[in-house]
């Protein structure tokens, strides 16, 4: 199986890559600057996405994990915070970057036959559970959830399944030291969810440990 993971330089993405390699799968991991085993991909830049697609050429992609994301508005105040450039950068990464990556790799996904797309969103995407704050990140992850649901509808006739996942509150640079679980537990759970993703599950919004999460 050929697995492509965006945002694989650290945290959950890096752990997913390590585990898939340990299982004997072929992994193409990406990072903004590349280097080492990573291929350069800045999902904010359409030309970078196009270059990455050209790098893959005609190679089939069995599983695409859209993991690249940012959370720059943590701790911002409603009065005077959340500047416009922060909105633009976050949506360019967390939403547009996901779409452009999927769009550019459609030929590779189609070549695999029965490919799967996993979009890493967040529990903060939920419209049902909205406690306030982190407006930019919440809005971007809600948009990514909506994007994934609609991709699932459009790609279903081609047999490409799409799942959207909350990876847990994970001890990473983004999640912080007070988070509930480590990257190992998150990656193990996510891999189990990706393995279970099929056409009956397409469009699902699930947590790393298998629970359905409210939209």
Task: Give residue ranges: language-model regions.
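N-terminal Rossmann NAD(P)H-binding glycine-rich loop of SDR-like oxidoreductase domains
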Residues: 9-18
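Catalytic loop of short-chain dehydrogenase/reductase
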Residues: 70-71, 78-91, 96, 100, ...
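Conserved Rossmann-fold cofactor-binding substructure of NAD(P)-dependent oxidoreductases
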Residues: 44-59
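Conserved glycine-rich Rossmann-like NAD(P)H-binding loop of the short-chain dehydrogenase/reductase
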Residues: 22-36
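Conserved mid-core alpha-helix of short-chain dehydrogenase/reductase
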Residues: 48-51, 97-104
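Rossmann-fold scaffold of SDR-type NAD(P)-dependent oxidoreductases
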Residues: 6, 61-71, 94, 119, ...
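Rossmann-fold cofactor-recognition segment
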Residues: 34-47
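C-terminal helical subdomain
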Residues: 164-167, 176-215
């Amino acid at each position: 199986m050929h697995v492509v993971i965006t945002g694989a330089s650290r945290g959950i993405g890096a752990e997913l890559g390590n585990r898939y390699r340990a299982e004997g799968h072929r992994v193409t991991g990406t990072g903004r600057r590349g280097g080492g085993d990573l291929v350069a991909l800045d999902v904010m830049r359409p030309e970078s996405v196009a270059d990455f697609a050209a790098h893959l050429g005609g190679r089939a992609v069995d599983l695409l994990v859209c993991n690249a994301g940012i959370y720059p508005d943590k701790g911002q105040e409603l009065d005077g915070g959340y500047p416009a450039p922060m909105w633009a950068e976050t949506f360019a990464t967390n939403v547009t970057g996901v779409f452009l990556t999927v769009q550019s790799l459609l030929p590779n996904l189609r070549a695999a036959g029965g490919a799967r797309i996993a979009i890493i969103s967040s529990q903060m995407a939920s419209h049902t559970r909205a406690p306030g704050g982190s407006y930019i990140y919440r809005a971007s992850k809600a948009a990514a959830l909506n994007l994934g649901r609609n991709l699932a509808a459009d790609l279903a006739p081609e047999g490409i399944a799409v799942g959207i996942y909350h990876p847990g509150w994970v001890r990473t640079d983004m999640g912080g030291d007070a988070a509930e679980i480590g990257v190992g537990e998150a990656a193990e759970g996510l891999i189990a969810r990706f393995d279970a993703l099929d056409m009956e599950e397409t469009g699902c919004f699930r947590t790393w440990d298998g629970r359905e999460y409210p939209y």
